[in-house]
Amino acid sequence: QKPDPSGTAQDIGYAKAKSIALNHAGVSENEAYDMEIELDDEDGTLVYEVEFKSSGMEYSYEINAATGAILKHEAEID
Protein backbone atom coordinates (compact mmCIF):
# COMPACT_ATOMS: atom_id res chain seq x y z
CA GLN A 1 0.00 0.00 0.00
CA LYS A 2 1.36 3.37 -1.08
CA PRO A 3 1.28 6.19 1.47
CA ASP A 4 -0.82 9.23 0.64
CA PRO A 5 1.54 11.80 -0.98
CA SER A 6 -0.22 14.65 0.86
CA GLY A 7 0.37 13.01 4.24
CA THR A 8 -1.75 12.15 7.27
CA ALA A 9 -1.63 12.98 10.97
CA GLN A 10 1.09 10.33 11.39
CA ASP A 11 2.90 11.04 8.13
CA ILE A 12 4.09 14.40 6.77
CA GLY A 13 3.93 13.11 3.16
CA TYR A 14 6.39 13.10 0.26
CA ALA A 15 5.86 16.75 -0.70
CA LYS A 16 6.57 18.04 2.82
CA ALA A 17 9.64 15.79 3.18
CA LYS A 18 10.99 17.17 -0.11
CA SER A 19 10.33 20.74 0.95
CA ILE A 20 12.06 20.25 4.35
CA ALA A 21 15.18 18.84 2.66
CA LEU A 22 15.31 21.53 -0.04
CA ASN A 23 14.82 24.35 2.49
CA HIS A 24 17.55 22.97 4.76
CA ALA A 25 19.95 22.66 1.81
CA GLY A 26 19.08 26.15 0.56
CA VAL A 27 18.19 24.72 -2.86
CA SER A 28 15.08 25.72 -4.82
CA GLU A 29 12.96 22.98 -6.37
CA ASN A 30 13.92 23.98 -9.93
CA GLU A 31 17.66 23.81 -9.05
CA ALA A 32 17.36 20.22 -7.79
CA TYR A 33 17.56 17.20 -10.09
CA ASP A 34 17.78 13.40 -9.80
CA MET A 35 15.34 13.71 -6.87
CA GLU A 36 14.58 10.42 -5.12
CA ILE A 37 12.24 10.08 -2.16
CA GLU A 38 11.33 6.85 -0.46
CA LEU A 39 9.59 5.90 2.75
CA ASP A 40 11.64 3.48 4.82
CA ASP A 41 11.37 1.77 8.20
CA GLU A 42 14.46 2.42 10.34
CA ASP A 43 14.19 0.22 13.44
CA GLY A 44 10.45 0.84 13.78
CA THR A 45 10.57 4.55 12.89
CA LEU A 46 9.23 5.59 9.50
CA VAL A 47 11.64 7.94 7.74
CA TYR A 48 11.73 9.59 4.35
CA GLU A 49 15.03 9.18 2.56
CA VAL A 50 15.41 12.18 0.27
CA GLU A 51 18.30 12.42 -2.20
CA PHE A 52 18.93 15.02 -4.89
CA LYS A 53 21.67 16.85 -6.74
CA SER A 54 22.22 20.55 -7.34
CA SER A 55 25.14 22.73 -8.49
CA GLY A 56 27.70 19.92 -8.43
CA MET A 57 26.64 18.73 -4.96
CA GLU A 58 24.79 15.59 -3.90
CA TYR A 59 22.46 15.88 -0.91
CA SER A 60 21.08 13.07 1.23
CA TYR A 61 18.52 13.42 4.03
CA GLU A 62 16.70 11.18 6.49
CA ILE A 63 13.54 12.86 7.76
CA ASN A 64 11.21 11.51 10.45
CA ALA A 65 7.91 10.77 8.66
CA ALA A 66 5.78 11.60 11.70
CA THR A 67 7.46 14.81 12.93
CA GLY A 68 9.39 16.20 9.95
CA ALA A 69 12.59 16.30 12.04
CA ILE A 70 15.84 15.92 10.08
CA LEU A 71 17.52 12.85 11.56
CA LYS A 72 20.57 12.78 9.31
CA HIS A 73 21.88 14.83 6.41
CA GLU A 74 24.92 14.84 4.17
CA ALA A 75 26.16 17.02 1.35
CA GLU A 76 29.09 15.98 -0.77
CA ILE A 77 30.67 17.05 -4.04
CA ASP A 78 29.06 15.05 -6.82
List where the protein language model places each region:
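Long, terminal "pre-/pro-" and other extracytoplasmic accessory regions
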Residues: Q1-D78
